Regions:
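Core structural elements
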Residues: 19-30, 162-171, 183-200, 245-251
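Flexible, glycine/charged-enriched surface loops at secondary-structure junctions
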Residues: 7-19, 28-40, 169-182, 208-214, ...
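Secondary-structure capping and boundary motifs in well-ordered enzyme cores
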Residues: 16-17, 128-135, 182-193, 215, ...
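Short acidic, low-complexity intrinsically disordered linear motifs used
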Residues: 413-429
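Active-site cavity-forming subdomains of large catalytic enzyme subunits
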Residues: 1-144, 148
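Internal maturation/activation junctions in enzymes
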Residues: 32-76, 171-178, 196, 201-247
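Catalytic alpha/beta core of large soluble enzyme barrels
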Residues: 89-91, 98-101, 108-148, 152-176, ...
C-alpha cells in the first residue's frame, strides 16, 4: 500500500515493480512451503536493481530474497560496460546480478530448426528453459547413476521424454488468458534434464570428451525420436525444444545424486536441513533421535544434521576449477541441450579474470550460468560442512535406522520455515 501511495500520479519505478512481485511470491505458501519461484530480468543500466541486494537488504526488504536477479542483454556490451557488471557481481559475493543474453537464447533456439527464434525470449527462474512471453516450462528428469551404460541412459531419457510429452497435453488453463494456452500448445515445450552428471565417469567428462559428445548426441536423438512418436500418438505438436539441464537442488537431495551438472560438495559432509518447530515432521525426526539443535539465527526453527558420503569416484567441488566447469557447460550446451544448461560456476579469486575473459569472448553463446565465489570456510550451522572419513563413520552411528511415521498431525500448521531463491542461498550453498 505504501508503494502505491508513494507512486501516486506517476509510473512505478523498476525497483517498486520488483518489490511488488517479490511480495506476491512471498505470500504464495501452501502447507508451510513456498510455492513460488521468481526471476527478475532488468536492463543493464538499471543500477537500482543491480544494487538491490546491497547493504542490509534482508532487514529492510526481506522479500527481495525471493528473486534471482539477472541483467538482460539484448546485444554484446562493449568491454567497459561488461567489466562494470562483472566487477559488481564480484563485489556482491552473492552471484548477482546474473547474466541472461536474449541474443544467445535466440541463437540457441534457432539451432534445431524446429522453433521460431525471432521472439524476445525470456527464461524460467533457474534459467535453463528458453521461453516466449506467456509460456510455461514442462520439466522431467533423468537421475544418472555412476554405473549407467549408454543403453541405460537412453532408456531413462526415453521415459522422461514420454512423461514430458504426456504433460504437454495438460493445457486447460481455466484462469489464464487464451494466449497462454495458444503458446503452450503451439510449441509443446519439454524440459528433459539430467541430474547426477558428476557421479558418472563418462558424463562428468573424466574419461574422454569425444566419447562424452557421442553419448550426449545419442541421448538427445533418443529424446527427439521419443517425443515425435508420442506426440503423434497423442495428436499434439512435436516439441519445439526438448533437452536441458536444470540445477536440481531439491530432486538431487531426494534421490542422493550430484545436483544437475554440479560437483558434489565433498567426499564426506554434513547436510543440515531446517524445519519450523511447528512442523509435525520436526517432532517425528526429533523423537526418532535424528541429531538436532536450535537454529542460532531463528528461535522458531530447528536444524537437523545428516551425514552424507559421495559415491566413490564422484567429482567434488574442491577438485574442479572454474574453467573446467565452463568447458563442460559448453559441451552440454552444444551436444545435449536444445534449451540451456543451468549451472552455478564456483570460482577462486585467482580465476576470476580468466573466467571474465572467457565469458566475454563467448558472450553471444552464454546464458544460464551464475557465478559464486568458492570458499573452504564454513560458518555456524552451514547447510553443507565437509568432514573427514573418521568423523563420517562416528556421526553415522548417531543417525537412526528406523523412524516411527505413525505420529499424526492434529492441527493446521501451515506457517512453516520458508526458503529463499536458489541463487546463493539454497540449491548449491
Amino acid at each position: 500500500v505504501e508503494v502505491f501511495r508513494g507512486a501516486a500520479g506517476r509510473r512505478l519505478s523498476s525497483i517498486e515493480c520488483h518489490d511488488l512481485c517479490c511480495k506476491i511470491a512471498q505470500i504464495v505458501v501452501v502447507g508451510g512451503v513456498r510455492r513460488s519461484a521468481l526471476i527478475s530480468l532488468s536492463n543493464l543500466t538499471d543500477d537500482r536493481i543491480r544494487r538491490c541486494k546491497s547493504g542490509q537488504w534482508w532487514v529492510d526488504n526481506p522479500q527481495r530474497g525471493l528473486a534471482n536477479n539477472s541483467a538482460c542483454y539484448t546485444e554484446k556490451p562493449d568491454f567497459p560496460a561488461f567489466l562494470d557488471e562483472w566487477k559488481s557481481l564480484y563485489e556482491s559475493y552473492s552471484g548477482e546480478r546474473g547474466m541472461f543474453s536474449r541474443v544467445a537464447s535466440q541463437k540457441q533456439a534457432a539451432r534445431n530448426e524446429r522453433r521460431d527464434a525471432t521472439y524476445d525470449f525470456g527464461t524460467n527462474p533457474c534459467s535453463e528453459i528458453i521461453l516466449r512471453p506467456y509460456q510455461f516450462c514442462n520439466l522431467s528428469e533423468v537421475v544418472v547413476r555412476e554405473t549407467d551404460s549408454l543403453a541405460d541412459l537412453k532408456r531413462k531419457v526415453r521415459v522422461a521424454t514420454i512423461l514430458g510429452t504426456l504433460q504437454a497435453t495438460l493445457t486447460d488453463f481455466r484462469y489464464l488468458r487464451k494466449i497462454w494456452k495458444t503458446n503452450t500448445e503451439e510449441e509443446a515445450l519439454l524440459g528433459v534434464s539430467l541430474t547426477g552428471i558428476m557421479d558418472h565417469p563418462v558424463l562428468s567428462g573424466r574419461e574422454d570428451n569425444v566419447k562424452l559428445k557421442k553419448w550426449l548426441t545419442a541421448m538427445r536423438e533418443e529424446a527427439i525420436a521419443a517425443n515425435k512418436e508420442w506426440a503423434d500418438r497423442l495428436g499434439i505438436n512435436t516439441s519445439a525444444a526438448i533437452t536441458a539441464v536444470k540445477p536440481s537442488g531439491t530432486v538431487s537431495q531426494l534421490v542422493d545424486s550430484a545436483s544437475g551438472i554440479h560437483p558434489r560438495y565433498a567426499q564426506y559432509y554434513i547436510r543440515r536441513v531446517r524445519a519450523s518447530k511447528n512442523d509435525p515432521l520436526c517432532a517425528v525426526l526429533e523423537a526418532a533421535g535424528v541429531p538436532v539443535e536450535d537454529d542460532v539465527m531463528s528461535p522458531s526453527t530447528k536444524v537437523f544434521s545428516f551425514v552424507q558420503k559421495a559415491p566413490d569416484g564422484a567429482v567434488t567441488a574442491s577438485e574442479m576449477g572454474a574453467m573446467e566447469q565452463l568447458e563442460l557447460w559448453e559441451i552440454y550446451q552444444d551436444y545435449w541441450c536444445e534449451h540451456k544448461p543451468s549451472m552455478t560456476c564456483y570460482y577462486r579469486d585467482h580465476e576470476f579474470l580468466e573466467v571474465g575473459q572467457w565469458l566475454y569472448n563467448k558472450f553471444d553463446k552464454i546464458s544460464g550460468i551464475s557465478f559464486l565465489p568458492y570458499s573452504e570456510h564454513t560458518y555456524q550451522q552451514a547447510p553443507y560442512e565437509p568432514i573427514d572419513k573418521q568423523t563420517y563413520l562416528k556421526l553415522k552411528k548417531e543417525i537412526p535406522t528406523v523412524i516411527d511415521w505413525d505420529i499424526r498431525e492434529e492441527d493446521d500448521r501451515t506457517e512453516g520455515s520458508q526458503q529463499l531463491a536458489c541463487t546463493g542461498n539454497n540449491c548449491e550453498l
